[in-house]
Swiss-Prot record:
Reported function: Large subunit of the glutamine-dependent carbamoyl phosphate synthetase (CPSase). CPSase catalyzes the formation of carbamoyl phosphate from the ammonia moiety of glutamine, carbonate, and phosphate donated by ATP, constituting the first step of 2 biosynthetic pathways, one leading to arginine and/or urea and the other to pyrimidine nucleotides.
Binding site for Mg(2+) 2: E298, N300
UniProt protein name: Carbamoyl phosphate synthase large chain
Domain MGS-like stretches: 936-1068
Organism: Cutibacterium acnes (strain DSM 16379 / KPA171202)
Binding, Mn(2+) 4: E838, N840
SUPFAM superfamilies referenced in this protein's UniProt entry, alphabetically: Carbamoyl phosphate synthetase, large subunit connection domain (SSF48108), Glutathione synthetase ATP-binding domain-like (SSF56059), Methylglyoxal synthase-like (SSF52335), PreATP-grasp domain (SSF52440)
PROSITE patterns on file: ATP_GRASP, CPSASE_1, CPSASE_2, MGS
Residue positions binding Mn(2+) 3: Q820, E838
Start and end residues of each ATP-grasp domain: 133-327, 671-867
């Protein structure tokens, strides 16, 4: 069928902020879809609340709305734009839920708007657990015994009928949110209670556990003419019981027989056809390893996390094809963009193995529950390609950027046998390393299979890696052993450790022996058809398929896996840098390891190398490509950390030079530069031992801010208020040493703000100044930022411009620079002073936001500067650009509901996973939008629980008066209530945790657990009891989905919004 000509304007719904379970893969999918629809001649309207995405750039859609994805705002856009159709299947769970909500509201029918792609009835059959079970029963497709429940009592009855263990799956939630495995009634009651609250339809499926079965995924594609195909098959390393987003995954499937594959393929095709899917669809199945019994676990009737992985694994652009199917085209009418010669109905063939490993946030959250189950916890993932499982697995391990380049983790190697056994029984993020260590200690593959239910085939591959280790030990300096190790994915540093040499020694030996990688093309057809895809992976074979271009080229290093502190913002900057490189006439080469991102779409760059971002792997590409230089400014700390080794190896680093990058990171060097330039900074010092840290803190006076150097996202940063706290920090959080110093600063309590600037070595452009709502002490990535500044005096703004210009020149910046300031009173003079907190001579996470609100594509301008142009050449004047008339607010978004035991209190260590943006004519309206977009819905009335420290009580009293004035009922613990009462404000009392007696006042936890309040304001204290109580309060509020504020500044911002939305009622 030809494309539909009765449609002209199409609305695409994005997926909103990055959350655990819904990450950058939807920016990749949405960008592909918008461009595909524009390619077909349609006018595309986009709504998304995430400014850090490529899809919200002005040139991706014809009209871009960065607005909350809520019924209120999407309805308003629909009424204003009157599109002919909506595509909801490219925005993840957010898009599907929005489509369902819109349909129930009747607005699409009222306006005559059609839902494109998979129909709403099919979405409901796949997403509604009861309807899905009924459909599978009708098809004769086996599903685990299950019942849908809407109350805890119903769940208990079902549990008694089906028997334990059970799996709880809440309806219409993301990444298994609220679900889990239950071994007894107590666990069932707890998990179902949470799941019902988090399900937007208050519904859970209670399902017979099939933990231990193989988990298989089929990524499917179907068009309106019923052409149905398998794009990719994937097999989880972990058996059923671990969420697929938290499992190591291989593509294609590795352990299925032809009979098993055909059986599951037929089942997937039948399901997709019966549902009437039009576009992409993911089918998850469980297979009994000892029989042909299988069960259908679930179907995702949309582009998903697995779709992005399948796209990058095969080269087949699923979202692009799905978008074209949505407007009527069929698979035999859509040309495969990879080969350019075949049609999209040909199923991709792989002559390589793909490995995906999740990237978890537990390096940031040491206190988190690291056990894996049916609720996803990973923030991102890496992918690696190789000719064997061993090669792709080891390449993926070193892509994780966790300080490990092989199957050896020191903390696991040091575990006692009993603890290691415990970790083998209960899957954790370090399971792969635990399995390896168990084999090292003499456990057999069969024993481990019986204990973990992981297939013997995969365990054999791990054992084979250890056999190669032993051969290397037995044959030091043997070129044949070296060749075998490299073919199976061993890194130079791993081999060097085994041989007792340096990585350089190994590198020289293998190059001298002709042991160098070749690069193979990803072409979707295993070489069967001619292809010229510029998408490559390395392996150790004979024929090289990547040829050096004759044009001058530049290599851009990506930012690797998404994790807290280094998210999609850096991929945004990478993509824009590539655009500028191409516009300047160079060939742009990208190297990255993240399958979720736009940067690893092979159509973005002239060449894509899907490789680990390590010195060895980067040098291998440089040896082949001989680029004119490497750009490291847009790949976050990942790329910055590679600048020094690459420069030492003679590689030209373009832009700001390594010595100046180091000077910004090195505390003493940076201090001396600021002193030389006459720029104030917080008094502080550098400690290379615990004793030095105590001495510096004693001299400065508490509180102090302590942090390691060379980190991103405020990792291991803390505000310390006493010597006892500092002792605990030095013991638990960091290990100070001469080469890893700890920085100790006086904590300055004031207004925090930041700038992103571009410098050509002489002139400095400052697109904008951002002002934080939360005062200093909350990490900038966790603070709400406002542009233009609202509380800043002109004198302070002028001083910031002056300091930024001085510092950019002082650091000899060529490219981009981020500087963070705190405006506070000088302790000695009492004068308002602008202090520099830190300077980062690289792109920051605010670049996408500031680029969008100022209209300056900062990464593109900075790249042109890096390549040798000046601001004057580009027609840009130095100094601060005029402020916009509209107010723009950027707000962090958190995933605490997915991370049990992680404290939601905000401080100097970053915890947010994503961001949203709101723009309007007033601050109050912009704030309202970001609160709605962040799912912190602003109530019009209700009860607010306030529990704060003694030093925060005076400020909290003033805030409480404002809430009281607009009609909110207030409740607090005894101490807070007494203080408020003395200040003339009566509030209800809730007992502190553990102090209530039978018949006494309700406790704080009871109040929260019965949803007896509509918001919680909890400011943490330093006493041990207060810390424990505060954690329990915050954890319960998160579990109940109650808006939680741990900063009075954020609470004051939401109060300001509420005040703007109500009429005052005062007696005369």
């Amino acid at each position: 069928m030809p494309r539909r000509t009765d449609l002209h304007r199409i609305l695409v719904i994005g997926s909103g902020p990055i959350l655990i379970g819904q990450a950058a893969e939807f920016d990749y999918a949405g960008t592909q879809a918008c461009l595909a629809l524009k390619e077909e001649g349609y006018e595309v309207i986009l709504v998304n609340s995430n400014p850090a995405t490529i899809m919200t750039d002005r040139d991706v859609a014809d009209k871009v709305y960065i607005e909350p994805i809520t019924l209120e705002f999407v309805s308003s856009i629909l009424r204003r734009e009157r599109p002919d159709a909506i595509v909801p299947t490219l925005g993840g769970q957010t898009g599907l839920n929005m489509a369902t909500e819109l349909a129930k509201s009747g607005i699409p029918d009222e306006l005559g708007i059609e839902l494109l792609g998979t129909k709403l009835s099919a979405i409901e059959k796949a997403e509604d657990r009861d309807l899905f079970k009924q459909l599978m029963d009708e098809l004769g497709q086996p599903v685990p015994a299950s019942e849908v429940v809407h109350t805890v009592d119903e769940a208990v009855k079902v549990g008694n009928t089906i028997g334990y263990p059970l799996i709880v799956r809440p309806a219409y939630t993301l990444g298994g949110t609220g679900g889990g495995m239950c071994c007894d009634e107590a666990e069932l009651v707890r998990i179902v209670g949470k799941g019902l609250e988090l399900s937007p339809v208050t519904e859970c499926l209670i399902e017979q556990s099939i933990a231990g079965f193989k988990e298989i995924e089929y990524e499917m594609m179907r068009d309106g003419a019923d052409n149905t195909m398998v794009v990719c098959t994937m097999e989880n390393f972990d058996p059923v019981g671990v969420h697929t987003g938290d499992s190591i995954v291989f593509a294609p499937t590795q352990t299925l027989t032809d009979v098993e594959h055909e059986m599951l393929r037929d089942a997937s095709i039948e399901i997709v056809r019966t549902l009437g899917i039009e576009g992409g669809c993911n089918v998850q199945l469980a297979l009994d390893p000892n029989s042909f019994q299988y069960y259908v676990i679930e179907v995702n009737p949309r582009v998903s996390r697995s779709s992005a992985l399948a796209s990058k694994a095969t080269g087949y652009p699923i979202a692009k094809i799905a978008a074209k199917i949505a407007v009527g085209l069929t698979l035999d009418e859509i040309r495969n963009p990879v080969t350019g010669t075949t049609w999209s109905m040909f199923e991709p063939m792989l002559d390589y193995v793909v490995a995906k490993i999740p990237r978890w946030p537990f390096d940031k959250f040491a206190q988190a529950d690291r056990r894996l189950g049916t609720q996803m916890k990973a923030t991102g993932e890496v992918m690696a390609l190789g000719r064997t499982i061993e090669e792709s697995l080891l390449k993926a391990v070193r892509s994780l950027e966790i300080g490990v380049d092989h199957l050896a983790l020191r903390e696991v190697a040091d575990l006692p046998d009993d603890i290691l056994e415990e970790r083998l029984l209960h899957a954790r993020d370090d399971r792969l390393f635990c399995l390896t260590e168990a084999i090292r200690r003499g456990r057999t593959v069969q024993e481990l299979h019986e204990q973990t239910r992981i297939d013997v085939f995969f365990l054999d591959k791990v054992a084979h890696i250890l056999e190669i280790e032993e051969r290397l030990r037995a044959c030091p300096d043997d070129s044949e052993a070296l060749w075998i190790a490299k073919r199976n994915g061993f890194s130079d540093p791993a081999i060097a450790r085994i041989w007792g040499e340096t990585p350089d020694d190994v590198r020289v030996r293998r190059v001298d022996n002709g042991i160098v990688p070749v690069y193979k093309m990803v072409d979707t057809c295993a070489g069967e058809f001619e292809s010229s895809t510029p998408y490559f992976y390395s392996t150790y074979e004979m024929e090289n398929e990547s040829k050096k271009s004759q044009r001058p080229s530049v290599l851009v290093l990506g930012s690797g896996p998404i994790r807290i502190g280094q998210g999609i913002e850096f991929d945004y900057a990478t993509v824009h840098s590539v655009k500028a490189i191409q516009a300047a006439g160079y060939e742009a080469i990208i190297m990255n390891s993240n399958p979720e991102t736009v940067s690893t779409d092979f159509s973005i760059s002239d060449k894509l190398y899907f490789e680990p971002l390590t010195f060895e792997d980067v040098m291998n590409v440089i040896d082949l490509e001989q680029p004119d230089g490497v750009i490291v400014q847009f790949g976050g700390q990942t790329a910055i950390n590679l600048a020094g080794p690459l420069s030492a190896a003679g590689v030209p680093i373009l832009g700001t030079q390594v010595a100046d990058l180091d000077r910004a990171e090195d505390r003493e060097g940076f201090e001396s530069l600021l002193a030389e330039l006459g720029i104030p900074q917080a008094p502080g010092g550098t400690a290379r031992s615990s004793e030095e840290a105590f001495a510096v803190a004693e001299e400065l006076g508490y509180p102090v801010l302590v942090r390691p150097s060379y980190v991103i996202g405020g990792r291991a940063m803390a505000i310390v208020t006493s010597a006892e706290e500092l002792k605990r920090y030095m013991r638990d959080a960091v290990h100070a040493s001469p080469d890893k110093p700890v920085l100790v600063d006086r904590y300055l309590n004031g207004l925090e703000c930041e700038v992103d600037a571009i410098c050509d070595g002489t002139d400095v452009l400052i697109p904008g100044i951002m002002e934080h709502i939360e005062r200093a002490g909350v990490h900038s990535g966790d603070s709400m930022a406002v542009y233009p500044p609202q509380r800043m005096s002109q004198q302070v703004a002028d001083r910031i411009i002056e300091v930024t210009t001085k510092l950019a020149r002082g650091l000899k910046t060529k490219g981009i620079l981020n500087i963070q300031f705190v405006v506070a009173n000088d302790p000695a003079t009492g004068e308002e002073t602008v202090y520099v907190i830190e300077a980062n001579p690289r792109a920051s996470r605010t670049v996408p936001f500031l680029s969008k609100v100022t209209g300056v594509s900062m990464a593109e301008v900075a790249t042109r500067i890096i390549l040798g142009e000046t601001l004057a050449d580009l027609g840009l004047r130095p100094g601060l650009l005029p402020f916009s008339k509209r107010i723009h607010v950027k707000s962090p978004v958190f995933s605490f509901s997915k991370l049990d035991l992680v404290d939601s209190h905000l401080g100097p260590e970053m915890k947010s996973t994503g961001e949203v943006m709101g723009s309007d004519d007033t601050v109050e309206k912009a704030l309202y939008k970001v609160f709605e977009a962040a799912n912190l819905h602003v109530p019009e009335y209700g009860k607010i629980l306030i529990t704060v420290t003694d030093d925060a009580k005076p400020e909290a009293l003033q805030l409480a008066r404002r809430f009281d004035r607009i009609g909110f009922q207030l409740v607090g613990t005894m101490g807070t209530a007494r203080f408020f009462d003395e200040g003339g404000l009566r509030i209800d009392v809730a007992e502190k945790i553990g102090s209530g007696e039978a018949g006494s006042t309700e406790s704080v936890l009871d109040l929260i657990s019965r949803n007896g309040c509509d918001a919680v304001i909890n400011v943490m204290g330093n006493g041990q009891d207060t810390i424990i109580d505060g954690k329990q309060i915050r954890r319960e509020a998160i579990a109940r989905g109650i808006p939680l504020f741990t900063s009075l500044d954020t609470a004051a911002a939401i109060c300001r919004v509420m005040e703007s939305r109500v009429f005052s009622t005062e007696s005369i």
